[in-house]
Amino acid sequence: MINHNVFKNLANINLENFKDKPTSLTEGQQEASLVLWTSADGHCKIGIWECQPGRFTADRTTAGEYCQIIRGRATVMMVDGKNSKEIEPGDLLVLPQGWKGEWIIHEHMRKLFVIDESSKH
């Protein structure tokens, strides 16, 4: 039998171990994350992520990502600077597999993420 899960109060789950963001273009920018659930085959992960204000690159070559913004504000754009989109609480951001771009975090951000690696296998 396959069980279901409920994760409550995602806005207030405690995230610890903030560390430097490896792809940051802003010195000292830090992030933290917590994976809440992983599929049995390991191809799908759901979790919470937080990041301090600043700018960083992102590469979704191997997996798509779906982001429900819980708090904070950011601008997300393609690697060439085109298709700039503002995101804020309540928004759903879809980054299809193959997307490359940049994020500019304007206000400390928290999001629920779903990473889907199923199409790379």
Where are these regions (language model features)?
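A generic structural signal for short beta-strands and their flanking turns/coil linkers
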Residues: 30-32, 42-47, 65, 70-72, ...
